[in-house]
Amino acid sequence: MISAKDYHIEMLSVGAADAFILYVIDKQNNEHLILIDAGNYKDGDKIINHIRKYYNNPVIDLAIVTHCDDDHYGGFVRMLEKLSNGDRDAITIRQFWVNDPGKNHIDVNDVKYVNSRPVVNNRAREIYNCRDLNLLELIDSLRIPRTEKFAESINN
């Protein structure tokens, strides 16, 4: 847990989508940038430009995907695509909090015409497809740590 000396919250202009920046300065004067959702795919560039313009250290310490609607995670797909391609204006993301719907949250017996855990897992993860990319696959290919923080709500 970060002990904050100062912080501010920004709600970014991404149309009907969602994207929030939580910027924290801890008691040792270290800066922490948390991005909560990232709007649609096209909003990824807008968010990168905003962070580069207004923040000294263009690194996202924590990226949080609140749920798997593309107007919440699509911008992350764009940002990771740029990072994967080695684009000069790409921004490093150090960690993700994102649920993986393929991580045994679905009972195979509840899915018609499927009787294999790997098939169910792969189909469930397709919910994060955007353009010809998949958010979870991009995160993993870039070796960015990802943690499930909202998993309890799935089973309740």
Q: Model segments located where?
A:
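A short acidic, amphipathic alpha-helical/loop segment
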Residues: 47-50, 75-79
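Residues that form or flank phosphate/diphosphate-binding pockets in enzymes
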Residues: 42-46, 71-74, 106
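Conserved beta-strand hairpin/beta-sheet module of binuclear metal-dependent hydrolase folds
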Residues: 2-59
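Metallo-beta-lactamase
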Residues: 60-71
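Active-site metal-binding loops of divalent metal-dependent hydrolases
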Residues: 36-41, 68, 100-101
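Flexible, acidic/histidine-containing loops and adjacent segments that form or flank the divalent-metal
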Residues: 1-8, 77-156
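Residue-level recognition of the N-termini of beta-strands and the immediately preceding loop/turn
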Residues: 32-33, 59-62, 91-95
